[in-house]
């Protein structure tokens, strides 16, 4: 990485974009991304990338499009401004000159000259930042060899527009959540259907995505693999899902509440009332084992519960078969 590309990256990331997460408008979820500039990764990389292409990139626009095929990145081809890079070089050169001179004994007049040069350089940097912003605002956006449209010439809005398309294309199973995200405050309610926190309409929205979680658990079980909460989270936060952590916790909790799976921590089978605390504690995720719940004859369970409520005078006997057995 050259000094010039390093400085251009700092301007793009720190002065133009100023964030490492972009909100998906359809569900309000923040998606992190990594930065790239001319094929060079800068900083920590994520599943998604915003890849800036500078005027010095050695490939043609058509080649740039072709090279983007099959990649989970938004390519931002900066509008060509030959002076940006030459002015960046001058900026760096002047900074070095001032720094070197300040380390020596200089006269009062030389000091004034350096001060003037420094002020000019500060102005040059501000002007450069504005020009880079304008270049991003007029950039060509490319995802998977196809151009993406945006009507905005605001740098961040334009990149955000392109990123919306990248999220939609990468996380094709995000639609199972139907534009919703759930919060950690809803985990307890999902595990306890009688709590009334989810009405029938809300609960029905959880059905399709929770069945996807159940299918994942059953597939892993069939392969003889132990499934932990961490296993589920790692798989479903990644593509093609892109689901957020709290929503996954709510879906696991909902499966427990509907007696589809059980949660065991350190060998202890958890009651529904204990589930939320374990799921919300990410440090427990690697030790929290999710298993398909054994199915029971519903008529026998109902009869046994009736026996408990009527014969044993226990109106609050649990509905879950396993909890009823332990009651």
Please annotate each region the language model reported.
Residues 1-327:
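Extended alpha-helical interface modules used as scaffolds for assembling large macromolecular complexes
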